């Protein structure tokens, strides 16, 4: 399949969140955030593990109180994936979770306090080799910037970010990444473009408060897709009012669609029409459900008739072309003598895909499967 990637990624420095490299050409990391009460340790640990199971590289956890900080200590002890502590208002919470092995601190300088408090957090992070994310958000800009610009603008987001980048620079701290999120696509995109020209640190991408599963996925795909196609971005989070597991799936789907990072199966499926020889929609939905555990990069085309089916199958790892009672099967673009009974397509195709994944895995170094 045509898979040339014309994207030239923006050059940046590298930091590490736990053992996950960020920036300087490292694979773009996909992260999410728990939506449980952090003080409910069991529920939070369960959600983190669920996120890890679908491929999350990093998970952010809100730590709003000292009680939550104590819970974070227990959560960290029971999980393996790198954890970011999300800190607002009380800088002392950042100091506390640093004692408990946090992998990264996310602070919003607009509400964390004065420069001396930021300095305390930075000195602690330096001592413990913990990176920081400066998280600028259009909904929580500093009062003086709102007075100056009257509303969130790309320039306001940039000025807020640079104000706090300058603080870290003065403190000789360079282990950080930056985000300038907004809920409006054009506002966020332009802010990131401006920021990308000003600093060399990694950028964390996101359209904040994007919306529900459908609308938020679309908004995030448009905004992040624009930036990623320009080579901007080193980590990302899809902010959805939905199960956080869906954020990881959508994140990987965006990267997969741009051929930046392939994880799992890329299904190529027709929307179906009266020419379909089998139930395309239910077939695809069921295969997506059954094969969520397959992380091997693979293109699978499922087309309901012979109009476009053979052409798509020629450039797929596995292809299915609808036929009368039995459908044609392609392997690596070659039509096979074997045909699938239309009443048993899901089981037959699942078996072929899993077998193909095993073959591909034998050709791909294990460490590359998660790239």
From Swiss-Prot:
The keyword Iron-sulfur applies. InterPro entries: Dihydropteroate_synth-like_sf, IspG_bac, IspG_bac-typ, NO2/SO3_Rdtase_4Fe4S_sf. One of its GO terms (molecular function) is iron ion binding. Its cofactor is [4Fe-4S] cluster. Pfam families: GcpE. The keyword 4Fe-4S applies. It comes from the Bacteria. Keywords: 4Fe-4S, Iron, Iron-sulfur, Isoprene biosynthesis, Metal-binding, Oxidoreductase. Pathway: Isoprenoid biosynthesis; isopentenyl diphosphate biosynthesis via DXP pathway; isopentenyl diphosphate from 1-deoxy-D-xylulose 5-phosphate: step 5/6. One of its GO terms (biological process) is isopentenyl diphosphate biosynthetic process, methylerythritol 4-phosphate pathway. Binds 1 [4Fe-4S] cluster. [4Fe-4S] cluster binds at residues 270, 273, 305, 312. Its EC number is 1.17.7.3. It catalyses: (2E)-4-hydroxy-3-methylbut-2-enyl diphosphate + oxidized [flavodoxin] + H2O + 2 H(+) = 2-C-methyl-D-erythritol 2,4-cyclic diphosphate + reduced [flavodoxin]. Converts 2C-methyl-D-erythritol 2,4-cyclodiphosphate (ME-2,4cPP) into 1-hydroxy-2-methyl-2-(E)-butenyl 4-diphosphate. PANTHER family: 4-HYDROXY-3-METHYLBUT-2-EN-1-YL DIPHOSPHATE SYNTHASE, 4-HYDROXY-3-METHYLBUT-2-EN-1-YL DIPHOSPHATE SYNTHASE (FERREDOXIN), CHLOROPLASTIC. NCBIfam families: ispG_gcpE, PRK00366.1. Belongs to the IspG family. HAMAP family: IspG. This is 4-hydroxy-3-methylbut-2-en-1-yl diphosphate synthase (flavodoxin).
